[in-house]
Amino acid sequence: MTKSFTKYHGLGNDFILIDNRHQLQPILTPEQAIELCDRNFGIGADGVIFALPGVKQTDYTMRIFNSDGSEPEMCGNGIRCLAKFIAELENNNKTKYNIHTGAGIIVPELQGDGQVTVDMGQPRLLASEIPTTLANADDKVVDQLLEVGGKSWFVTCVSMGNPHCITFVEDVTAIDLAKIGPKFEHNPVFPERTNTEFIQVISPKYVKMRVWERGAGATLACGTGACASVVAGVLTQNNERLVTVELPGGCLEIEWSTIDQKIYMTGPAEKVFTGIIA
């Protein structure tokens, strides 16, 4: 049976989008996702995203398989791509969707300029919510020392429905992601592994970020990581609440609202091509 797909990217973080509206389970297996994500022998992508029927009064359900076959709770760049994909499938004037994810209900909204703004919900700061065994007396991890790769790093941990470990550095270009990234990801203090963000503060309103994603490795962008990093920057007094985050693939605008304490992410999602899986 052939299956159609559409490839999208959000700042170079690329995904294979599958119309899965006819059933509640993904029509592809994690093993098939690994094959499709292979950049030499497959389509090439950081993950496969499925648009499934909504549950609990939501419009849609989002499932995603990473390029290694693992399933994350959510993906910030991916949900912007999913919103654009859904809008194309429905072909109507609707611009806002309630999407059920493993991280809870996420609400993306298409903007008139082609950008997508996503209500990412409130960040979670308790060590048990991340999860991590690294915690201060208040059960939070803020600017705490962690030994990784024979070096001491000051880290702050934030969950955006998926785990993030953020560390501030003088120069993000000096970080050997391929070497240090896996050591953070698989550190035993993170029982479910972790995404890791390395942040260079240019000003209180502008930071540079490189990321090692759990299950995907070094990517050009990570939406949830950008959100978590701004939260970490506020907690450590490194940046303000409205920040431009520069990633290798481009920039995201992140706001941690003082009104509802939610994180709002704004960025692009671009269609690349469509095709058929034989």
UniProtKB/Swiss-Prot annotation:
Subcellular locations according to the entry: Cytoplasm
Active site: residue positions: C75 (proton donor), C222 (proton acceptor)
Classification via InterPro entries: DAP_epimerase_AS (IPR018510), DAP_epimerase_DapF (IPR001653)
Entry's Gene Ontology cellular component terms: cytosol
GO process terms (BP): lysine biosynthetic process via diaminopimelate
Catalyzed reaction equations: (2S,6S)-2,6-diaminopimelate = meso-2,6-diaminopimelate
Positions annotated to bind substrate: N13, N66, G76, N77, N162, N195, E213, R214, G223, T224
UniProt pathway annotation: Amino-acid biosynthesis; L-lysine biosynthesis via DAP pathway; DL-2,6-diaminopimelate from LL-2,6-diaminopimelate: step 1/1
Keywords, in A-Z order: Amino-acid biosynthesis, Cytoplasm, Isomerase, Lysine biosynthesis
Subunit structure: Homodimer.
Cross-referenced HAMAP family: DAP_epimerase
NCBIfam families on file: DapF
Protein name in UniProt: Diaminopimelate epimerase
Organism: Trichodesmium erythraeum (strain IMS101)
